[in-house]
Amino acid sequence: MQDEDCLHLTVTASVEALTGGKKRPVMVFLHGGAYVSGGGDLDAYSPVGLAQRGLVMVNITHRLGLFGYLPIHDRAPANLGLYDQIMALEWIQGNIADLGGDPNRVTLFGESAGADSIFCLMIAEGTQHLFHQAILQSAPLGVRMMDREQMIQALGALAHHRLASSEAPRTSDEMLSLQVELLMEAKKHPSGLMAFGPSLGHAPLPPLSEVSHKVQLAAKQINLFVGYTTHEGAPFARMNDTLRSYFDLPLIGWLIERLMVWIVSRKMFIWGIVQLHSRYLRAGGSSRKYRFDWWPSQSDLRSTHCLELPFLLGTWTDWAKAPMLHGPESRVVLESLGTKMKDLWAAFAKGLMKLENVNIVGDETYGEIIS
């Protein structure tokens, strides 16, 4: 059950971490959901498997959507949800040692919007002391680097107009109805897939023109591990009604779909992720890269967006009904490959990761590989 009572975090640690004298590395998870859904405490995001590897785990929940990310004249500033995340990280710095964690070894990791949040925290003003490493899984950097300001202004003006029509306080349900209207309005804009989210050029974030410089500065302070799934764009290509109408054409429909998934995957995710990795290395920073390229036999989504998450968080019970895992082999692969992926993520958090580039697949054997 999700609701707007969302300003909290959860700490997961072993008894040994809580009672032993040695402080453990900390991993902080930021969830995805396009900044409109999700929460750190969902069962599917349980970090027990990682905590069992000698880590103290923290899951953050924060304001989303209209409540957290839309600047509205005279009513709400931008980036409130980002400030929620910053406050949570400040709490971790001040308190995690009492729970067995080392505040000087904090690794952020997140997927999709969560990865985008981490990218924003990397370039935000005055946040670099709050964490030391970052894992960006499927960050939508192609959308992030679009100029979203025109859309933000239009949505903010519409929200202001709707709210100004009455002086009566609005219920959360009424605000969520307004949010749905704003999401529909956002579809008119090129960056409408991220209608809400941190806004560049609004405190504490730099304008778009300064992002490259901020990344160079971050490279001197924060170790990076970035990656993507091979077919990130599969669900997003299907969201476009016009495109989807071509996918059922006889003989060529499947080819059109494959081509569109290839294009969307690269424009929204892969090109931006690879560019960030390369820019980091050129700036003298430490960056590692992975590609997740497994999918179950009965899933036409193939190696889709979010598919790596069940291998890191939650249990088979939490993920069994997910369409992206349809296939008789999924449970066995989830348990075997998931063990290796958790080991890899934990090794990065501990500063013990040796691989530079990792292909995560089911049965192929090329490059530096986990299978």
Stretch-by-stretch model annotation:
Residues 238-251, 362-365:
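Short Gly/aromatic-enriched secondary-structure transition segments
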Residues 234, 278-371:
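Mobile gating loops/cap/lid regions near enzyme active sites that modulate substrate access
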Residues 128, 133, 137-243, 260-264, ...:
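Substrate-access "cap/lid" subdomains that shape
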Residues 1-163, 215-222, 226-236, 352-353:
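Serine-hydrolase-like catalytic core of hydrolytic proteins
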